[in-house]
Amino acid sequence: MKFGIVVSEWNFNITGALLNGAVNTLKKHGVKDENILVKTVPGSFELTFGANQMMENCDVDAIIAIGCVIKGDTPHFDYVCMGATQGITELNATGDIPVIYGLITTNTMEQAEDRAGGKLGNKGDECAISAIKMIDFVWSLNK
């Protein structure tokens, strides 16, 4: 199994923790370093482009898209969340490999921290497990 991870640089204190959770979980499941490709994009809105480029140009079986958007005082939050979500959904509907949705959308930094290794666990771990399961699913159909 080969994995691509596209991670947003924005809110990297959160996305970095999610990335570490995903990578550590993949390694716990026997995935070697050389089978994990990590690339960064500036923000969560760029996750779709990054995942699409990875899908087209890299030898991976699944992609994990990791980002974090925290609500502010303007509607920017809604546009970024909607755009990234629709983009990842489109890639899953039209692409040949699964793209796992690892976008954390919260009202506060504390809520994000809770989901990035805090009291609610690490959503990066869950994304890695989903990626493994989706590869197994695809491979089961191709046998």
Swiss-Prot record:
Top-rank EC class of the record's enzyme: transferase
Keyword Ion transport: no
Annotated catalysed reactions: (2S)-2-hydroxy-3-oxobutyl phosphate + 5-amino-6-(D-ribitylamino)uracil = 6,7-dimethyl-8-(1-D-ribityl)lumazine + phosphate + 2 H2O + H(+)
Binding site for 5-amino-6-(D-ribitylamino)uracil: 10, 44-46, 68-70, 101
Enzyme Commission number(s) from the entry: 2.5.1.78
InterPro entries, per database record: LS (IPR034964), LS/RS (IPR002180), LS/RS_sf (IPR036467)
Keyword Cytoplasm annotated: no
Active site: 76 (proton donor)
Top-level taxon: Bacteria
An individual GO BP term: riboflavin biosynthetic process
Leader sequence segment: none
GO cellular component: cytoplasm; cytosol; riboflavin synthase complex
Keywords from the named record: Riboflavin biosynthesis, Transferase
Positions bound to (2S)-2-hydroxy-3-oxobutyl phosphate: 73-74, 115
Pathway: Cofactor biosynthesis; riboflavin biosynthesis; riboflavin from 2-hydroxy-3-oxobutyl phosphate and 5-amino-6-(D-ribitylamino)uracil: step 1/2
GO molecular function per UniProt: 6,7-dimethyl-8-ribityllumazine synthase activity
Similarity comment: family membership: Belongs to the DMRL synthase family.
Function according to Swiss-Prot or TrEMBL: Catalyzes the formation of 6,7-dimethyl-8-ribityllumazine by condensation of 5-amino-6-(D-ribitylamino)uracil with 3,4-dihydroxy-2-butanone 4-phosphate. This is the penultimate step in the biosynthesis of riboflavin.
HAMAP family hit by this protein: Lumazine_synth (MF_00178)
Protein name: 6,7-dimethyl-8-ribityllumazine synthase
Organism the protein comes from: Bacteroides thetaiotaomicron (strain ATCC 29148 / DSM 2079 / JCM 5827 / CCUG 10774 / NCTC 10582 / VPI-5482 / E50)
Gene field: ribH
